[in-house]
C-alpha cells in the first residue's frame, strides 16, 4: 500500500493485508455532521429551502390563526446571524456556541363580511423576529454548551409502521399463539389489533380498554355486510334435484376431510370416498380431469354462514341476517320459502377461519353511531358523548395531520408490508390501511405469512442529532403557538407587529433543556481521540422514546444477523447496558430514512466488479452476499464453484453456485467498529476479551511521548485524521512560518482571487479535556516543506506522525516472577518510570467565585486573616497564584475573604468602630486551596469580572498579554498577506510595458522587479500595463487585498472589544477566577494497565532494572506478565502480537546498524538493500531521495511498523518469516536470565514487544484518607466517598469479623466515637488534647434516629439509662 502523504513518507508501514479495498471508508463522524447540516440547512438559500429539518418544523406549526380567523401569522423564511463568540471563546467563558435565529413572519389581518362570512385582506405586515439561539456544531461534530463539549448520541428506536407479532403462547395456559398487530406512528395514537383466546379480534387505542374490531370498522363507515364481503369470498350454492351444487376450487378443498362421499355434480360419480383426506395433489388431479362442481346434501350445509341478508322481496321481512349460521331450523325455513340459490361465506375452518364473523356476532354495537360513542367512552371516560364530538375525536385520532404522523418512513414501511401504494406524502392512516392490517392479521391466524422480527434492523431506525433536535424544536414551537393564539385574540390586531405576538422563550427553553439535560446529550468522553470518535458513533437504545434498562429483554440486546456490517457485534459496554448501547460499524452509514446501510461490491455473472452499492437490512434480505475473503482470480472471478454466502431472509451461511452470488463484502473489517478494527489479530481473540479490548482502548490516557504501535492494523491514520486530534492541511501549499502555537501555509493550489492565499492553523497548547487529560498539539513540518491537501501537519494528543498512538511498545516476558504477577498483576521495570515511558500530564481546573452576599461582598485579596507570609508566597498583589508556581495539597491558589455575621453591637462599640475603622475579625478565610492528592504546576489563570466591576492588576495584565498576542497575530497575518499579494503583483507586472506608474516613472518603459523595488510597495498599484485582462485581475486582487486588510483589523478590534467588555457571570457573582494546575503522573503500583486484547492488570511492583530478567544480548525486559493469563482467556492475539512486535524491533535494530555504518562509509546502498528485503518493491521507498531515506531510516531504527488488518492479517508463516528476517528463532522464544542471580532460567521464555496502554483508572485519583471531615446531617455518620471527603465504611460483615474475634472494645469504638456518637467524639478530642487516654462511649445518634422513627409509627420507646433495678420483692403468700 503506497502511502504518498507527507507523514507516510517519514514512516512507512509494512502492509500484510491481501484484500484490495474498493470502497473509501466514509468520514467517521459523518453521522453527526450530515444529520445536523440537514437540520439547519445553512448552506441553502433562505427562500428556497426544501421541506425538511428546521424548515419543516416552521411549516408544520405556521400559519397560526386566531380563534375567530380574523388574522393569521405566516412563516416566510429563517436565517442565522453570526455567533456572538467563537468556539474557543465559548470554551473559555463557559458560554454556549450558538447562532441567533432570525425568522421572518408575515401578519395578515382580514376584514370579515358579517353577512356572508367572506374574508378580504385588510392589512399585511412583515417583520424579522428573534427566535432564540440554536447551538451550532463544531468542526468535530460536537456542541459546546456552557463551556463544555457535549455529544448528542444517536438513538435506535422502533421504526414507525405496522408490526405483526404473537405472544409466543405465554398469555393463555393452553399455549395457544395469540396474534397481534400494532400500528406505530412517528407521533400520535398507537392502534393495536389482537386476538384473544376465544379467537375474537379486538382493537385497542393507546393501550386502553379493548373494543371488538368490528366496532372500529363500523366507525370507519362499513356495515355488517360490507365487513363480511371485505374479509370473505362469497360462494353461490345452487339447488338441484339431487342436492346443492357447489363450484369446485382446488385452494378451497385442499386438506378437506370428507364425512360423506365426494360426488361430481355433473356425472354423479364418487370422486373421493368418505373418511379420506383430500391432498393438494389429488385435488389438482381432479381439476385436471375436469371436475367443475360437487354435489352437497342438506346436512352438509348446516354450520355454514350466510353471506347476505335473506329478505322477502314483497314484505321486506328478514328471514336470516348476513353472517348467521345455518341450522336445521334455518334450512327448513329456507327450503319452505323456496330459495334456489344461497350465497354462503367461504369459511371452511381449515384455510379460512370464522374470526371476523364471530367478532361481528359478539359485537354489541350494530351502527356507526354506537361504535363512535363506544370509542369516545373508552378514550374519554366520564364525558357524555355527542355524535359531533365523537366523530371529531375519532377523526382526530388517526386522520388529522396535526395530531397523527406516520412519517415518510412509516408510510414506506407500511406500503412494503401490506402491499399498498399510498404516496410517501400521505402520512395519516387511511381506511384501506386499517382494513389491510386486519386482513393480514387474520391471514396470520389462518397460517398465511410470517410474523415480523422486531430486532431486525429493517424494523429499527436511527434518530440522529438533527432529527432529535427537530422534535425538540417542534415541542418548543407548539408551546409557543398556544401563547400566540391567545395573544392574537386579546390584543388590538390592527396595531400590533409580529414581534409583539411572539415570545421566543418556550422555543429557546426547549432547546436549552434538550442540550443541557436530555439523556442523549452527553458530556463528551475526551480521554483520547479514539474515545471521542467512538462516542460520536454510538447508537443508544435508551433515552426518551426508547427502551429502559429494566424492561429490555435478552432478544433486544442480542447480536442479530442484520447487524452484519451495520452495528459492531463486539463493542458494547459490560454491565446493565450490554447490547443496548452499540457502535456503528466502520463502513456503515445512515440513509435518509434513518436505516443503517452497509456497502457491498456488485457481482455480475460470477465476476466481482468495483461498483459499490449501499444496502439497508431490508434490501439485503433479497440477495446472496459473499464474504470479503473469498478467493478471486486476477479478473475478479470466483476461483471456487461453490461460494459460501449469507442468503435468504434468515441470513444463514450456505454454499451457493458462483453465478448465483449477487454481492460481496467490500472489506473484512466492515463488520466491526472503529475500536475493534484497531485490535491486531482480532480474529485470534475470544469475543469477550475483544469486547474488553475495544472498551479499554477508549480509556487509554494520552502519554507525554506518544508512540505508534509496531503492530497496527492500518486504521490508526484514519482515526487520527477523522477525530480532529491531528491537524490536516486544508489546501496544498508551502510552509511559510511556524512556531509551537501556529503554522502558516502559503497555498499553491485552490487559489481563489476572492479569498486569502494564506491558511493559518492555531495549535492547542496544554488545554484541559473533559476528562482532565492534556490536549497538546505539536507541529510536524519545517519552514519550506511542501504539503498536499489532507496531509497531517501537526500531531495532537495520542497521535504520532499522524497515527493514533494510545500507548507504548514495551519489551515483555511471559513468565512468573516471585508471585508479583499473580492474578493478572503486572511487574514493571524501573526504566519505565525513569524514562517517563508511561508518564501522563493531567490538567486539573479549580475555580472560585466572589459573590455579593447579604452581609457584604466577598473579596479576592492577598490580605487574609491568620495566615503566615510563607503560605502567601505564591500569590501576587491581587491574591492570585503566579503561573509557573509549584503547588501541593493545602496551598492557597486564590485568597478570598467572606464577611462574617456578627452579634449586634452596643452603641459604644459602634462609636469605637466608627472612629478606629474596621476590625479584622469580621471576615473569615474562604480561600481556594489545593485539594488533597493534587500536586503540580500552575499553567494558566483566567480572571473573569462582572460587567462594570473594576478589574484588578492581574486581570489587566492578562488582558494586556492577550491583546499583545492578538496584535502579533494580526501583524503576522498582515505581513504574510502583504508578502503574498505583493509577490503575486510583482509576478503579474514583471516584464510588462508600463503605460502609467507612480510619480517619477517614465511612461512606456519596461516594468522589472528592479524598477518595482525603487518604490514603496503601496505605490505598486499605480503601475498600469496595456493589457485589460491583466489590469482587471490586478484590480480584483487589490479589492480583495483591501477587504482582507479591513477584515483583519475589524476582527482584531472585535476581539479586543470582547476582551474589555467584561464577562457574563452567574447572578450574584462579582468575579470568578479559574486556576489550571498541571499534574505529572508517573506510573506507580496500583495503576491499571492493559494491552489491546482485553489483557488488563494492575501494576504490583516496580523493580530496579538490574533485577529484571534479561536476554542473551543483555537487554532487560520492561514488563513481566503472567503466562497463565492467556490460556483460559483465549486471547491468543497478544502472543502473536508479541512475536511480530519482536520481529519489528529486531528489524529496526538492523536498520539502526546500517545507519551507523552509513555515518562511517557515507554509502546508502546497504540501507536501501535492507529496506528492500523488509518491504519488497515498495513504491514510496523507491521514490525517496537520500535525505528522506535517511530520515525514514532514523524513524524506523526503533522498530519497523507493520499493519495487520483484522480478519486479513499476518498468518503464522508471515510471522515466522519476519522473525527469521530479524535474525531471531522462529519459535519466538528466547533464553532468559534472572536479573538478581544471573542464572539462566530452565525453560525458554516467550519474549517480544507488546503495545501496552495506561488506563484512566489511576491510583492517585482513588487513594484517599480522612481524619476529621463532614458528617451526614440526620445520622451524624461520616459521609462516604472521596468526592465528599468521606470515611471508610465499616459494614455489616466487618462488624461480624470483630464480633468473631471478641474484640469488644474495638467494636464499641467503631460503632460509637469513630462513627456517630456526637458527644463521645467531642470528649475523645478533649481527652487527646489533655494527653489523657481514657474516654467513655455514649449513645450513637443512629439509635436516636431509630427511636424517632418508631415514635413516628406511634410506638413509644423510652431508654432508661439507670442500671437494671432489682426486681420488686415477691409478696408473701397469704
Curated annotation (Swiss-Prot):
UniProt keyword annotation of Ubl conjugation present: no
GO cellular component: a single term: DNA-directed RNA polymerase complex
Keyword Transferase annotated: yes
Keywords linked to the UniProt accession: DNA-directed RNA polymerase, Nucleotidyltransferase, Transcription, Transferase
GO molecular function: DNA binding; DNA-directed RNA polymerase activity; ribonucleoside binding
CDD domains, per database record: RNA_pol_B_RPB2
UniProt catalytic activity: RNA(n) + a ribonucleoside 5'-triphosphate = RNA(n+1) + diphosphate
UniProt cross-references to InterPro entries, sorted A to Z: DNA-dir_RNA_pol_bsu_ext_1_sf, DNA-dir_RNA_pol_bsu_external_1, DNA-dir_RNA_pol_su2, DNA-dir_RNAP_su2_dom, DNA-dir_RNAP_su2_hyb_sf, RNA_pol_bsu_bac, RNA_pol_bsu_CS, RNA_pol_bsu_protrusion
Subunit (UniProt): The RNAP catalytic core consists of 2 alpha, 1 beta, 1 beta' and 1 omega subunit. When a sigma factor is associated with the core the holoenzyme is formed, which can initiate transcription.
Protein name (record): DNA-directed RNA polymerase subunit beta
Amino acid at each position: 500500500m503506497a502511502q504518498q502523504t507527507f507523514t507516510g513518507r517519514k514512516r512507512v508501514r509494512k502492509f500484510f493485508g491481501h484484500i484490495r479495498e474498493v470502497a473509501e471508508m466514509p468520514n467517521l463522524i459523518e453521522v453527526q455532521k450530515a444529520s445536523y447540516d440537514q437540520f439547519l440547512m445553512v448552506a441553502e438559500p433562505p427562500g428556497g429551502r426544501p421541506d425538511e429539518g428546521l424548515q419543516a418544523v416552521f411549516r408544520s406549526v405556521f400559519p397560526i390563526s386566531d380563534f375567530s380567523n380574523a388574522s393569521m401569522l405566516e412563516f416566510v423564511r429563517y436565517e442565522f446571524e453570526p455567533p456572538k463568540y467563537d468556539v474557543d471563546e465559548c470554551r473559555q467563558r463557559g458560554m454556549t456556541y450558538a447562532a441567533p435565529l432570525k425568522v421572518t413572519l408575515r401578519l395578515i389581518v382580514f376584514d370579515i363580511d358579517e353577512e356572508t362570512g367572506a374574508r378580504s385582506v385588510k392589512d399585511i405586515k412583515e417583520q424579522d423576529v428573534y427566535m432564540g439561539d440554536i447551538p451550532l456544531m463544531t468542526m468535530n461534530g460536537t456542541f459546546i454548551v456552557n463551556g463544555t463539549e457535549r455529544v448528542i448520541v444517536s438513538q435506535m428506536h422502533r421504526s414507525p409502521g405496522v408490526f405483526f407479532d404473537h405472544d409466543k403462547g405465554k398469555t393463555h395456559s393452553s399455549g395457544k399463539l395469540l396474534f397481534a398487530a400494532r400500528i406505530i406512528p412517528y407521533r400520535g395514537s398507537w392502534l393495536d389489533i389482537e386476538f384473544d383466546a376465544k379467537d375474537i379480534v379486538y382493537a385497542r387505542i393507546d393501550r386502553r380498554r379493548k373494543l371488538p374490531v368490528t366496532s372500529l370498522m363500523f366507525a370507519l363507515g362499513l356495515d355488517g355486510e360490507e365487513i363480511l364481503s371485505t374479509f370473505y369470498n362469497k360462494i353461490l350454492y345452487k339447488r338441484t334435484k339431487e342436492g346443492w351444487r357447489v363450484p369446485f376450487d382446488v385452494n378451497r378443498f385442499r386438506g378437506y376431510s370428507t364425512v360423506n362421499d365426494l360426488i361430481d355434480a355433473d356425472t354423479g360419480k364418487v370422486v373421493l370416498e368418505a373418511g379420506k383426506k383430500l391432498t393438494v395433489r389429488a385435488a389438482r388431479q381432479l381439476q385436471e380431469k375436469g371436475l367443475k362442481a360437487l354435489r352437497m346434501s342438506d346436512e352438509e350445509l348446516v354450520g355454514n354462514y350466510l353471506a347476505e341478508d335473506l329478505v322477502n322481496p314483497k314484505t321486506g321481512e328478514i328471514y336470516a341476517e348476513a353472517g348467521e349460521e345455518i341450522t336445521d331450523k334455518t334450512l327448513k325455513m329456507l327450503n319452505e320459502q323456496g330459495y334456489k340459490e344461497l350465497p354462503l361465506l367461504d369459511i371452511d375452518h381449515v384455510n379460512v377461519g370464522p374470526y371476523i364473523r364471530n367478532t361481528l356476532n359478539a359485537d354489541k354495537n350494530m351502527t356507526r353511531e354506537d361504535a363512535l360513542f363506544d370509542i369516545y367512552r373508552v378514550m374519554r371516560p366520564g364525558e357524555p358523548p355527542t355524535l359531533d364530538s365523537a366523530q371529531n375525536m375519532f377523526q382526530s385520532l388517526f386522520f388529522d395531520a396535526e395530531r397523527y404522523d406516520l412519517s415518510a418512513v412509516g408510510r414506506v414501511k407500511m406500503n412494503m408490508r401490506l402491499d399498498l401504494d399510498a404516496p410517501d406524502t400521505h402520512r395519516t392512516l387511511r381506511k384501506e390501511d386499517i382494513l389491510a392490517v386486519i386482513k393480514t392479521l387474520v391471514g396470520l391466524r389462518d397460517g398465511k405469512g410470517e410474523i415480523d422480527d422486531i430486532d431486525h434492523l429493517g424494523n429499527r431506525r436511527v434518530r440522529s442529532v438533527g432529527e432529535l433536535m427537530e422534535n425538540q424544536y417542534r415541542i418548543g414551537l407548539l408551546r409557543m403557538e398556544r401563547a400566540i393564539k391567545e395573544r392574537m385574540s386579546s390584543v388590538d390586531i390592527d396595531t400590533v407587529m409580529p414581534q409583539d405576538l411572539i415570545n421566543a422563550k418556550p422555543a429557546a427553553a426547549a432547546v436549552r433543556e434538550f442540550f443541557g439535560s436530555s439523556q442523549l446529550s452527553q458530556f463528551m468522553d475526551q480521554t483520547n481521540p479514539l474515545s471521542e470518535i467512538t462516542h460520536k458513533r454510538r447508537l443508544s437504545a435508551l433515552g426518551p422514546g426508547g427502551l429502559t434498562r429494566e424492561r429490555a429483554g435478552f432478544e433486544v440486546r442480542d447480536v442479530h444477523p442484520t447487524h452484519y456490517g451495520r452495528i459492531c457485534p463486539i463493542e458494547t459496554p459490560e454491565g446493565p447496558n450490554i447490547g443496548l448501547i452499540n457502535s456503528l460499524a466502520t463502513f456503515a452509514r445512515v440513509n435518509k430514512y434513518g436505516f443503517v446501510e452497509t456497502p457491498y461490491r456488485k457481482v455480475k455473472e460470477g465476476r466481482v466488479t468495483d461498483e459499490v452499492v449501499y444496502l439497508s437490512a431490508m434490501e439485503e434480505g433479497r440477495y446472496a452476499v459473499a464474504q470479503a475473503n473469498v478467493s478471486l482470480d486476477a479478473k475478479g472471478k470466483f476461483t471456487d464453484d461453490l461460494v459460501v454466502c449469507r442468503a435468504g431472509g434468515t441470513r444463514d451461511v450456505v454454499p451457493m453456485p458462483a453465478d448465483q452470488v449477487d454481492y460481496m463484502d467490500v472489506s473484512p473489517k466492515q463488520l466491526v467498529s472503529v475500536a475493534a478494527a484497531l485490535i491486531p489479530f482480532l480474529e485470534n481473540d475470544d469475543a469477550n476479551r475483544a469486547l474488553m479490548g475495544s472498551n479499554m482502548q477508549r480509556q487509554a490516557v494520552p502519554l507525554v511521548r506518544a508512540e505508534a504501535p509496531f503492530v497496527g492494523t492500518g486504521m490508526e491514520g484514519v482515526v487520527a485524521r477523522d477525530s480532529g486530534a491531528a491537524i490536516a492541511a486544508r489546501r496544498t501549499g508551502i510552509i511559510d512560518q511556524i512556531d509551537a502555537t501556529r503554522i502558516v501555509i502559503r497555498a499553491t493550489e485552490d487559489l481563489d482571487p476572492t479569498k486569502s492565499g494564506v491558511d493559518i492553523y492555531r495549535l492547542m497548547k496544554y488545554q484541559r479535556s473533559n476528562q482532565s487529560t492534556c490536549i497538546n498539539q505539536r507541529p510536524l513540518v519545517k519552514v519550506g516543506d511542501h504539503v498536499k491537501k489532507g496531509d497531517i501537519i501537526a500531531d495532537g494528543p495520542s497521535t504520532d506522525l499522524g497515527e493514533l498512538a494510545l500507548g507504548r511498545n514495551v519489551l515483555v516476558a511471559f513468565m512468573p516472577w516471585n508471585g508479583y504477577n499473580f492474578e493478572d498483576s503486572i511487574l514493571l521495570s524501573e526504566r519505565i518510570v525513569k524514562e517517563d515511558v508511561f508518564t501522563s500530564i493531567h490538567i486539573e481546573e479549580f475555580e472560585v467565585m466572589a459573590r455579593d452576599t447579604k452581609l457584604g461582598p466577598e473579596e479576592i485579596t492577598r490580605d487574609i486573616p491568620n495566615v503566615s507570609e510563607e503560605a502567601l508566597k505564591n500569590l501576587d498583589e491581587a491574591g492570585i497564584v503566579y503561573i509557573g508556581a509549584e503547588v501541593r495539597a493545602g496551598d492557597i491558589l486564590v485568597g478570598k475573604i467572606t464577611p462574617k455575621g456578627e452579634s449586634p453591637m452596643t452603641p459604644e462599640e459602634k462609636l469605637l468602630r466608627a472612629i478606629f475603622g474596621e476590625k479584622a475579625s469580621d471576615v473569615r478565610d474562604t480561600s481556594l486551596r489545593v485539594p488533597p492528592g493534587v500536586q503540580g504546576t500552575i499553567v494558566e489563570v483566567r480572571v473573569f469580572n462582572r460587567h462594570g466591576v473594576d478589574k484588578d492588576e492581574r486581570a489587566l495584565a492578562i488582558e494586556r498579554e492577550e491583546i499583545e498576542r492578538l496584535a502579533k497575530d494580526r501583524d503576522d497575518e498582515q505581513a504574510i498577506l502583504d508578502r503574498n499579494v505583493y509577490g503575486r503583483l510583482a509576478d503579474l507586472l514583471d516584464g510588462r510595458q508600463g503605460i502609467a506608474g507612480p510619480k517619477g516613472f517614465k511612461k512606456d518603459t519596461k516594468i522589472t522587479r528592479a524598477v518595482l523595488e525603487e518604490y514603496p510597495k503601496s505605490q505598486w498599484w499605480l503601475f498600469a500595463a496595456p493589457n485589460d485582462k491583466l489590469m482587471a485581475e490586478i484590480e480584483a486582487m487589490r479589492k480583495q487585498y483591501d477587504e482582507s486588510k479591513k477584515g483583519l483589523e475589524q476582527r482584531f478590534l472585535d476581539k479586543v472589544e470582547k476582551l474589555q467588555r467584561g464577562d457574563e457571570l452567574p447572578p450574584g457573582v462579582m468575579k470568578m477566577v479559574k486556576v489550571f494546575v498541571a499534574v505529572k503522573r508517573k506510573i506507580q503500583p496500583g495503576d491499571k494497565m492493559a494491552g489491546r486484547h482485553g489483557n488488563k492488570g494492575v501494576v504490583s511492583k516496580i523493580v530496579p532494572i538490574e533485577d529484571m530478567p534479561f536476554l542473551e544480548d543483555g537487554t532487560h525486559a520492561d514488563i513481566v506478565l503472567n503466562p497463565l493469563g492467556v490460556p483460559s482467556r483465549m486471547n491468543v492475539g497478544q502472543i502473536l502480537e508479541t512475536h511480530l512486535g519482536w520481529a519489528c524491533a529486531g528489524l529496526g535494530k538492523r536498520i539502526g546498524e546500517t545507519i551507523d555504518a552509513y555515518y562511517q562509509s557515507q554509502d546508502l546502498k546497504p540501507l536501501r538493500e535492507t529496506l528492500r528485503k523488509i518491504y519488497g518493491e515498495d513504491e514510496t521507498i523507491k521514490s525517496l531521495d537520500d535525505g528522506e531515506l535517511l530520515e525514514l531510516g532514523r524513524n524506523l531504527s526503533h522498530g519497523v511498523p507493520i499493519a495487520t488488518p483484522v480478519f486479513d492479517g499476518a498468518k503464522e508463516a508471515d510471522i515466522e518469516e519476519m522473525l527469521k528476517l530479524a535474525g531471531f528463532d522462529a519459535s519466538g522464544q528466547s533464553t532468559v536470565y534472572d536479573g538478581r542471580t544471573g542464572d539462566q532460567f530452565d525453560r525458554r521464555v516467550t519474549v517480544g514487544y507488546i503495545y501496552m496502554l495506561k488506563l484512566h483508572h489511576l491510583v492517585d485519583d482513588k487513594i484517599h484518607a480522612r481524619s476529621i471531615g463532614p458528617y451526614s446531617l440526620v445520622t451524624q455518620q461520616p459521609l462516604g466517598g472521596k468526592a465528599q471527603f468521606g470515611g471508610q465504611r465499616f459494614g455489616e460483615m466487618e462488624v461480624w469479623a470483630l464480633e468473631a474475634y471478641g474484640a469488644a472494645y474495638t467494636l464499641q469504638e467503631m460503632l460509637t466515637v469513630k462513627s456517630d456518637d456526637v458527644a463521645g467524639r467531642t470528649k475523645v478530642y478533649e481527652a487527646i488534647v489533655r494527653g489523657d487516654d481514657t474516654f467513655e462511649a455514649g449513645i450513637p445518634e443512629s439509635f436516636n434516629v431509630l427511636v424517632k422513627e418508631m415514635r413516628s409509627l406511634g410506638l413509644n420507646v423510652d431508654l432508661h439509662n439507670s442500671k437494671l433495678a432489682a426486681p420488686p420483692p415477691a409478696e408473701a403468700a397469704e
